[in-house]
Amino acid sequence: AITENLQREDVTPREEAAAYKRALESGRHTIESLVGKFGKSETYIRSRLKLCDLIDALAEQLDREEISVGVATEIAKYNVEVQQEVYEEHFSDGCRLSWKNARIKEIARRLYDRYMTRLDTYRFDKTECHTCHHNTANQILFKDECTDGCAGCQNRNCMMRKNDEYL
């Protein structure tokens, strides 16, 4: 049934994300098996899965095509509190500082600058961070593009715990 749903021409990004999530939760599939089955890249499937983490208000805007999949994916990388704040300040009706017409890269930069904690500013051992999915350096398609300063931690609680332990 999942395969049939994903082969429909009118499947929305969130329906696609939900189908991937159901397939994974069924225990019959892994990310790797979905890559093989649907001919999509691992990065593509993981980015679609992030759409399941969107707050309702942003998910509804995505469904109405008021925001793009790329914008929704960038915002979905952040926790619920950040998403709610971003929605209220930049995507809600009547907001004063709308980001609705900004390009994806610009939104990603704004989110990073405002809500991300750069790993290179901390001195604790970052060995675990090198493979952590909360490390933004592990979320980019071409790792060669990641030079100094692009590794950011999206899990502030974990990062603060590591820093406290170091200190």
Residue positions per predicted region:
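C-terminal helicase lobe and adjacent C-terminal extensions/tails of nucleic-acid helicase motors
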Residues: 90-114
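Cysteine-cluster motifs in flexible loop/terminal segments that predominantly coordinate metals
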Residues: 113-166
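Context-gated lysine
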Residues: 21, 37-40, 50, 77, ...
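Sequence-pattern detector for short linear motifs
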Residues: 25, 43, 51, 106-108, ...
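Amphipathic, charge-rich alpha-helical segments that serve as recognition/docking helices
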Residues: 1-91
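A general marker of short, structured functional hotspots
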Residues: 16, 34, 40, 83, ...
